[in-house]
Each structure stands twice: as C-alpha cells, then as structure tokens.
C-alpha cells in the first residue's frame, strides 16, 4: 500500500507541489479515426520480461524496455514503495491494458494493436531531462517506424505523473497522438498535456480494480 493510502488530500498536495518541467509549446496531433488507428501502450511502471535485468534503483535509469505484443511474463520493476503492487499481481491490465486493447481491436473499436509496447521507470529526476532529450525521442522514432498512430500512457507511483506528462509532450512533438491516464490532475494541468484522463484510483491502479474488464475498457 502506498504511504499516501487513500488520502486524496495528501495526494493532491503532493501533486501540486511537485516540481515539473516546462514546455514552450503543447503540440496536438490530429490522427486518423480510432477505428483505423494502430495503438501502442507506454507505461512508466518499469515493466520488463522476467529474463531481463530490469531497472536500477534511483532516478538515473532512463532507458526503456520493449514489450512484445504477446508477452505476458512481465515483472513490475518499479522500485518505489509508494504504490499498490497487489493490483498488478492480480491483473497486469491495471497498469498495462494490453488485453483490453486486443479486445477493442477484435471489436473494431481500434484499427490494430501495435506489435511492440514500451516501459520506462517513472521515478525520474525533477527535470526529466534524460527522457526529454534522449530515450523519449528514441522511443517515439521506434513507434513511428512501426506505424503507430496513438499512444496510451499510464503510470504507477506518485512521481509517475510528471514522467507520463513529459512523455506525452515528447511523443506529440514527434507526431504521435497521446492520451495520458493519471490520477494527478494538477500535474497534467500544470504541464499542459494535450489530452489526459483523470482517475481517482490509488497509485498502482491506473485503470481501477483488477479483473474489472468492463470498467477498464
């Protein structure tokens, strides 16, 4: 359980005082209809394959992991203690809604699911400069090369909102449409991201209760 627990006031106070990077411009990419779009997920939950070394402790690991579309043997490699890990243990879709995307593709709601998806660690430095200038643009180029149109971005820990919002700016500037899913409305508004869905769930449960397929969609 997060040290914040379900204390909404404490979470909002933390989000309001969190240092965030500034962007001179907010890009807003128009894309094809959703039913024709290829969608990828980028999460800051630090996910990686069981066989991979994963992420280092601290705020200096800005690399990203590539997650193949059919990979389910994933480990939650985010080292923060400030979020609920039980949800992911029960249902990876609470932070990485890959099964929900597959279902939406079958139903024709989205055009296609991307072949690869990506994971960063959300606990980055206050400037998030390494992701802004290095690994973020590199990840964007990979998705563009794979013909991705839309990126769904999710987080886990209390610091993740700053990282997911930074990634949204980086991806939109590269030509990818994004939607950020975050409980920290204050951070999304201060960072002026193009699109954000505000949730009220505890850290670690970006899409709500585990195994709640209807709600997660």
Protein language model regions, located:
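Metallocofactor- and cofactor-centric catalytic cores in central/energy metabolism, strongly enriched
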Residues: 1-217
């Amino acid at each position: 359980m997060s040290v914040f627990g379900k204390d909404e006031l404490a979470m909002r106070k933390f989000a309001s005082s969190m240092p965030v990077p500034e962007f001179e411009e907010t890009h807003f990419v128009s894309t094809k209809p959703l039913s024709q779009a290829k969608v990828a997920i980028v999460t800051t939950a630090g996910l990686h394959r069981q066989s991979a070394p994963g992420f280092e402790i601290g705020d200096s690991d800005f690399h990203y992991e590539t997650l193949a579309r059919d990979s389910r043997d994933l480990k939650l490699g985010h080292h923060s203690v400030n979020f609920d890990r039980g949800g992911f243990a029960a249902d990876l879709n609470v932070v990485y809604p890959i099964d929900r995307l597959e279902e939406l593709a079958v139903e024709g709601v989205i055009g296609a699911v991307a072949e690869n998806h990506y994971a960063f660690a959300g606990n980055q430095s206050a400037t998030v400069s390494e992701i802004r200038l290095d690994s973020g643009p590199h990840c964007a180029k990979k998705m563009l090369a794979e013909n991705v149109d839309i990126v769904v971005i999710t987080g886990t820990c209390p610091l993740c909102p700053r990282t997911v919002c930074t990634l949204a700016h980086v991806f939109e500037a590269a030509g990818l449409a994004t939607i950020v899913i975050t409980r920290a409305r204050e951070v999304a508004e201060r960072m002026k991201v193009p699109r954000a869905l505000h949730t009220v769930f505890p850290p670690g449960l970006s899409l709500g209760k585990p195994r709640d397929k209807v709600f997660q969609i």
